[in-house]
């Protein structure tokens, strides 16, 4: 029994919603993968906030038709396609897929789309190598903390320097008085 028109419209609406939440989408050829292997890929992607959707190319084509950000995906819609839609952790999702691809050796990367740009596998790997949002936030926090620490040390150093200078004044005065006294004794003798 085929899909009804309403059912097809619901599938397309679901794809549009998934795409609206995604930062990156890439298309893979899933020819030769078993159901358990697709499930394994989905399980690997789940912790990264990504999903693997298997649907007809025509449904995906209809879903991206009106959205300029995803239009370039149409060039990858041939053969048996699975769509990895990455919501949060781009690097983690790409690494999860690469690990799966290495383990199964049955899937091929066709291409990806991010911010309206078609990407090849090397470009997607380069994006995956960038630090995650959490890593960048940690680096920024560390830099800000370093600045605050240096500022606090600098602010504390000013009164400490003044205090050392004030403590040095009586000793310096004493040495000056002794030097003058010694000079006068030397002149008197």
Curated annotation (Swiss-Prot):
Q: Which UniProt keywords apply?
A: Ribonucleoprotein, Ribosomal protein, RNA-binding, rRNA-binding
Family matches, as SUPFAM superfamilies: Ribosomal protein L10-like (SSF160369)
Q: Name one Pfam family in it.
A: Ribosomal_L10
Regions that span the bilayer: none
Q: Name one GO biological process term.
A: translation
Give the highest taxon in the source lineage. Bacteria
One MF term in the entry's GO annotations: large ribosomal subunit rRNA binding
Physiological role: Forms part of the ribosomal stalk, playing a central role in the interaction of the ribosome with GTP-bound translation factors.
Q: What is the protein's quaternary organization?
A: Part of the ribosomal stalk of the 50S ribosomal subunit. The N-terminus interacts with L11 and the large rRNA to form the base of the stalk. The C-terminus forms an elongated spine to which L12 dimers bind in a sequential fashion forming a multimeric L10(L12)X complex.
Protein name, per record: Large ribosomal subunit protein uL10
Identify the coding gene.
Answer: rplJ
